[in-house]
Design a protein with these regions (language model features):
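Active-site beta-loop-alpha substructure in enzyme catalytic cores
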Residues: 29-40, 126-135
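Active-site catalytic loop in hydrolytic enzyme cores
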Residues: 88-135
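Feature marks short, surface-exposed loop/turn motifs that line or immediately flank catalytic pockets
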Residues: 11-14, 44-47, 114-116
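A short, N-terminal amphipathic alpha-helix
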Residues: 21-37, 66-79
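Short glycine-enriched, charge-decorated loop/helix-capping segments at active-site entrances
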Residues: 53-60, 125
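Active-site-proximal beta-strand elements of phosphoester/diester hydrolases
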Residues: 2-14, 96, 109-112
Length: 135
């Protein structure tokens, strides 16, 4: 049995609706190439910054991003791994990946456990843990 996997690279911008449109376009392009399993990148709907994680976070049950991906999986009869989005759960925000089946149902979910923190004195400082919680 062969499975065709499509890995989508997306230029994320500071506009959630545009990012969802870009993801949709990439998914439909992969579908046209007969992909069985489509993979979106980490934080595909949100610029990669702590401030934006807060601004762009969505609750799983009220998520325009996840609703769109579910619809696309169902309409195109394909599995989609929604790389990750900033997911709000209670007072916490997680970097969460979702796997959708061909019916558009969430069949798996993973909250990132090992957050990316870097502090190189005088060069670079970025700590996901300043905003995100470990799953």
């Amino acid at each position: 049995m062969k499975i065709k996997i499509a890995l989508c690279q997306i230029n994320v911008v500071d506009n959630k609706e545009k990012n969802i449109e870009n993801a949709t376009s990439m998914i439909l392009k992969a579908v046209k190439q007969n992909a069985d399993f489509i993979v979106l990148p980490e934080m595909f709907n949100c610029p990669y910054s702590n401030e934006k994680f807060i601004e762009y976070c969505e609750e799983e049950t009220h998520s325009p991003t996840l609703s769109k991906i579910a619809k696309l999986a169902n309409e195109n009869n394909t599995y989609i791994l929604a790389g990750s989005i900033p997911e709000k759960e209670g007072s916490k925000i997680f970097n969460t990946s979702y796997l959708f089946d061909k019916n558009g149902e969430i069949i798996a979910k993973h909250q990132k456990m090992h957050l990316f923190d870097i502090d190189v004195k005088g060069k670079i400082y970025f700590k996901e843990s300043d905003t995100l919680s470990s799953g």
